[in-house]
Regions:
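Active-site-adjacent beta-strand/loop module that shapes the phosphate/pyrophosphate-binding cleft
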Residues: 4, 61, 68-85
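Short amphipathic alpha-helical surface micro-motifs
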Residues: 1-2, 14-15, 45-47, 64-67, ...
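The catalytic Nudix box helix
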Residues: 33-66
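Short, charged/polar surface micro-motifs in flexible loops or helix N-caps
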Residues: 12-17, 25-27, 39-40, 68-71, ...
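Detector for glycine-centered tight turns/loop "hinges" at secondary-structure junctions
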Residues: 15, 57, 75-76
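N-terminal strand-loop-strand
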Residues: 1-33, 60
């Protein structure tokens, strides 16, 4: 069984939530929050900030921990509330 952890954020900018358009092999897969896999030795909060920057170009800071989302295939995501500055 494969287990993976990813972290991301609910990013707020000027009162709006940042969503990313997910497209895989030219197929629309919906709108998603920015998130990605934790690298070895990386803290969850650092992963969230790095992934927001990599996927959206936004520099943000963490306001608070929001929660965890678990998926059936043994992965889970950790989300933080972030504001862009």
């Amino acid at each position: 069984m494969v287990e993976a952890t990813s972290c991301g954020g609910v990013v707020i900018y000027k009162g709006k939530i940042l969503l990313l358009y997910k497209n895989f092999k030219n197929r629309y897969e919906g709108w998603v929050l920015p998130k990605g896999t934790v690298e070895e030795g990386e803290e969850h909060a650092d992963t969230a900030l790095r992934e927001v920057k990599e996927e959206s170009g936004a520099t943000a800071h963490i306001i608070k921990f929001v929660g965890t989302s678990r998926y059936n295939f043994m992965t889970y995501s950790i989300f933080y509330l972030l504001y862009i500055y």
